[in-house]
């Protein structure tokens, strides 16, 4: 239990009814979880406004209710009514207080940007743990607390859940947390209630703009920029054309990284490395640090991811040797993830599931000396048809051979989605085949692999399911590959 006054101590509010001399048994923002003695925070969601449940909360003898608009409570109710300007903002501070401000007991690292967040969080975790720290992680794929892995629903959880995860990290002995910070999370105040020790900006491209996300690119950029008003040390990629827009209202100390001479920490002399089953890139780190490094992931964007991690970890006094060792060993599920299937060609799994990501990935891989570039992909159902045309055209232009298959068809027919992709493919001279069953498509790619080929399984990445007509059926591409190899008597 916590005193209501204590939970409200960092908020500006008006007590419209009742008194503050109460004990609270729980903090609740889901109307289905209202219990006697709780503090119910009315949140406006996509499908339901918690203010509609205010009277119900009072009837169930909630200790207090936080609202941002007028509500009617039963006249006889003794529930305290608190009014604030923004209930999501209030929830963040109340949650931090409820869990005894766990972020103050951790070194907190928040990474925002259109691309690179997931990979960079794992690189930072790898480097810091290699140097002896215990690091929690919050991101798109999962939440990691000690040995516990929790499947992620959102890139950045709701503020109450985030504070609960922080508390569990402290309890498990973590001293640091690295997390992805989405623009939606910043817009919805999920990361309020504490100050990041480090805030990092990777890059910005038009994405997440639409009816259910951001109304415009300007709004998207503004939301990203909020991180630099909520951290002590800001670190920004100054090669990105938008970096000054993102940092112009910063309230933190600021340093930069990139490949240009103006960066405080720089990567130079890039060298592509291509060994059997391995695509990577080596580079020299100069400026704030000076050493030679290599990352076991291909492409210039991998250098940016590595450089971001180095820019963060240098503040932890990690040795150059520990950084180099961790970068070579780092592996991120579903992010340019190499899977050994042959001694003659390379196969990888990647989450590239939209036009921008697929184009970036295939363009990167074309920079390496190789045989054919083979792309196996599909598109999700009940999503933009335009994306299907575009991705078909991208693969047709960049891949030497495309195998079009099913992704998450959802409530559409896989064959109809494939036909849309083929429409885009036919705008090019690209060679393709369509195989709707994803396992059969992967098997075809492996069976027809040629010496020097690079085969990319794009779109599913870290996902371990296939969504068909409202049901998520188990399907992990690593398991599919293992089954295919076993059926052929191949082992590594």
Predicted segments — roles?
Residues 10, 58, 71-77, 172, ...:
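Acidic, Mg2+-coordinating active-site environments of NTP-dependent enzymes
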Residues 14, 76-85, 150-153, 251-258:
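Active-site regions of enzymes building and remodeling cell-envelope glycoconjugates
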Residues 8, 91-238, 242-250, 307, ...:
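Phosphate-binding loop of NTP-binding sites
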Residues 24, 37, 62, 78-79, ...:
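Short, well-ordered alpha-helix to beta-strand connector turns
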Residues 45-47, 183-184, 205-208, 240-241, ...:
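Short glycine-rich anion-binding loops that position phosphate/pyrophosphate groups of nucleotides
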Residues 1-93, 229, 263, 268-270, ...:
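N-terminal leader/targeting and accessory segments in enzymes
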Residues 63-69, 234-238, 376-377, 400-408:
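Short internal beta-strands
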Residues 1-15, 36-39, 251, 288, ...:
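ATP-dependent carboxylate-amine ligase
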């Amino acid at each position: 239990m916590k005193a209501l006054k204590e939970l409200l101590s960092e908020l500006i509010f008006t007590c419209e009814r009742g008194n503050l001399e109460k004990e609270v048994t729980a903090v609740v923002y889901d109307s289905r979880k209202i219990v006697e003695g709780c503090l119910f925070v009315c949140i406006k969601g996509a499908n339901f406004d918690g203010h509609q449940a205010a009277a119900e909360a009072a009837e169930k003898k909630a200790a207090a209710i936080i609202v941002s608009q007028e509500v009617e409570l039963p006249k006889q109710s003794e529930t305290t009514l608190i009014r604030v300007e923004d209930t999501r903002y209030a929830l963040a501070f109340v949650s931090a207080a409820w869990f005894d401000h766990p972020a103050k007991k951790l070194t907190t690292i928040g990474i925002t940007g259109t691309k690179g967040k997931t990979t960079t969080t794992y690189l930072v975790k790898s480097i810091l743990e290699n140097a002896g720290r215990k690091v929690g992680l919050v991101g798109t794929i999962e939440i990691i607390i000690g040995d516990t892995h929790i499947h992620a629903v959102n890139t950045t959880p709701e503020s109450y859940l985030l504070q609960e995860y922080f508390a569990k990290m402290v309890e498990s002995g973590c001293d640091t947390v690295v997390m992805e910070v989405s623009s939606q999370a910043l817009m919805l105040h999920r990361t309020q209630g504490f100050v990041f020790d480090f805030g990092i900006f990777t890059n910005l491209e038009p994405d997440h703009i639409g009816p259910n996300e951001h109304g415009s690119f300007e709004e998207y950029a503004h939301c990203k920029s909020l991180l630099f008003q909520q951290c002590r040390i800001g670190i920004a990629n100054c090669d990105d054309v938008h970096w000054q827009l993102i940092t112009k209202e910063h309230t933190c100390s600021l340093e930069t990284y990139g490949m240009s001479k103006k960066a405080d920490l720089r990567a130079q002399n890039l060298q592509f490395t291509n060994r059997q089953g391995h695509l990577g890139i080596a580079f020299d780190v100069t400026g704030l640090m000076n050493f030679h490094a290599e990352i076991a992931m291909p492409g210039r964007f991998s250098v940016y991811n590595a450089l971001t991690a180095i820019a963060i970890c240098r503040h932890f006094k990690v040795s150059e040797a520990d950084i180099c060792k961790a970068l070579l060993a780092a592996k991120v599920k579903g992010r340019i993830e190499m899977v050994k299937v042959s001694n003659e060609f390379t196969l990888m799994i990647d989450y590239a599931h939209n036009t921008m990501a697929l184009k970036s990935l295939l363009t990167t891989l074309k920079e390496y000396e190789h045989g054919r570039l083979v792309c196996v992909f599909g598109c999700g159902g009940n999503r933009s048809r335009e994306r299907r045309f575009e991705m078909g055209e991208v693969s047709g232009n960049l891949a030497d051979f495309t195998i079009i298959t099913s992704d998450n068809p959802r409530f559409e027919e896989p064959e109809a989605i494939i036909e849309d992709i083929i429409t885009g493919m036919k705008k090019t001279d690209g060679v393709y085949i369509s195989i709707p069953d994803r396992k059969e498509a992967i098997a075809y790619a492996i069976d027809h692999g040629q010496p020097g080929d690079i085969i990319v399984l794009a779109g599913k990445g870290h996902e371990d399911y296939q969504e068909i007509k409202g049901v998520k059926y188990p399907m992990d591409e690593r398991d599919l590959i293992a089954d295919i190899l076993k059926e052929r008597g191949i082992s590594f």
